[in-house]
């Protein structure tokens, strides 16, 4: 019987009493827990998310009455395994909960049907992982005062006249412009440090700032004007930065039209010189005792001697040609020498005479002279049309006589 009774008791005994033993919570502990929960709730509400509408819906869904907030806070504090809210509520806890509800930032308004329909479930704060990118922490941004825009010169003149007529401001009004001038000096130092990193200096520009501030001291408005003019070295790192309107543009040699072709020619010449230099060094490093190397040296020396002799002869001929009076109008020295020079010149340039006597290939400044020369040569070398016809007739008659003699039908 005893085993049967024990089995029945174990079957009827509630499982919650065995798994979760009861525990009592002291008022001090409950107060501390409520305080920590309130801090955590404020932290969660202060963390903004990417979706602004979600935060608004979350705030609207958290609007509860005093009694409902008290019940919700007590349910959040006590887990179902420890104790219920009715068993622990004491006068001290009620006072603490009411004060906590009054301190909360939630507006005291009841639930509505739309808020219940649109209520969204937020993620618990203890389940947020550190690497969750959807949560953006909001840092307190420093307040940056914007510099006022410079006013026209007419207003500054009127303000200077007004300052001359009005009494001097008190030290309190002078402290505010000093702080603003310090801010402008700091901004100018930042501009100088940022421009110091650039490479090319383009020029200097003057920057002037006019700061005005109105202060009411003893019921009378006083206007303080502070004008600072500084010279700042403005530099640009690349050509993408636009030039200021007042600066003069610096012409670059590379922008000229013929500079590109000249630079390419110079580069080609330098490349050829470097190739020749490398070949010379390679020849010097080879064996000097080889017979092929000695023959190559002798042939190169003879070739150089010939080229130098030809260059000297050509230079001598040019000096003679330029020294003669052939090209002067109406003045001739020795006709035999002049004829020799001209015939030799035409003979040496016989391969290019067709290019020299075509008007399209002649430069514009020499076309008049070229036309005169070509006309004279045509008169000398070519025959008139009448003479051409007579010559053709003679040739035809001679051909007919030859055919008659040969009895060719």
Curated annotation (Swiss-Prot):
Polar residues bias: start-end ranges: 198-208
Alphabetical list of Pfam families matching this protein: SPESP1
Residue ranges that the Swiss-Prot or TrEMBL entry lists as coiled coil: none
Residue spans of biased composition, Low complexity class: 209-223
Acidic residues: compositionally biased ranges: 167-177
Major location category of this protein: cytoplasm
Family membership: Belongs to the SPESP1 family.
Protein's UniProt name: Sperm equatorial segment protein 1
Organism for this UniProt entry: Rattus norvegicus
């Amino acid at each position: 019987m005893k085993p049967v009774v024990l089995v029945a008791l174990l079957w009827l005994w509630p499982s919650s009493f065995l798994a979760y033993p009861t525990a009592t919570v002291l008022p001090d502990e409950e107060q501390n827990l409520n305080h920590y929960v309130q801090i955590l709730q404020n932290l969660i509400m202060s963390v903004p998310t990417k979706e602004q509408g979600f935060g608004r819906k979350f705030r609207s869904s958290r609007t509860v009455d005093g009694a409902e907030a008290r019940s919700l806070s007590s349910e959040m504090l006590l887990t179902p395994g420890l104790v219920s809210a009715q068993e622990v509520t004491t006068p001290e806890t009620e006072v603490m909960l009411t004060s906590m509800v009054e301190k909360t930032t939630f507006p005291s308004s009841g639930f509505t049907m739309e808020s219940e329909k649109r209520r969204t479930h937020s993620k618990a704060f203890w389940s947020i992982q550190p690497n969750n990118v959807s949560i953006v922490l909001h840092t307190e941004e420093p307040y940056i005062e914007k510099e006022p825009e410079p006013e026209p010169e007419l207003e500054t003149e009127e303000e200077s006249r007004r300052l001359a007529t009005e009494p001097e401001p008190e030290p309190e009004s002078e402290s505010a412009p000093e702080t603003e001038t310090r801010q402008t000096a700091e901004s100018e130092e930042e501009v100088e440090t940022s421009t110091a990193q650039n490479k090319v200096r383009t020029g200097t520009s003057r920057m002037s700032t006019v700061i005005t501030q109105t202060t009411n001291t003893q019921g009378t408005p006083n206007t303080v004007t502070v004008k600072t003019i500084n010279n700042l070295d403005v530099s640009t790192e690349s050509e993408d930065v636009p030039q200021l309107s007042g600066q003069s543009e610096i012409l670059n040699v590379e922008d000229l039209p013929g500079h590109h072709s000249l630079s390419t020619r110079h580069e080609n010449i330098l490349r050829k010189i470097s190739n020749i230099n490398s070949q010379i060094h390679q020849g010097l490093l080879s064996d000097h005792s080889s017979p092929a190397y000695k023959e190559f040296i002798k042939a190169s020396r003879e070739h150089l001697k010939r080229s130098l002799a030809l260059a000297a002869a050509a230079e001598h001929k040019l000096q003679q040609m330029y020294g003669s009076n052939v090209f002067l109008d109406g003045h001739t020295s020795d006709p035999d020498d002049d004829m020799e020079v001209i015939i030799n010149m035409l003979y040496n340039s016989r391969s290019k005479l067709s290019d020299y006597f075509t008007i399209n290939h002649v430069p514009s400044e020499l076309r008049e002279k070229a036309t005169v020369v070509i006309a004279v040569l045509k008169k000398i070398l070519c025959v008139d049309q009448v003479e051409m016809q007579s010559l053709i007739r003679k040739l035809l008659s001679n051909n007919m006589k030859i055919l008659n003699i040969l009895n060719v039908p």
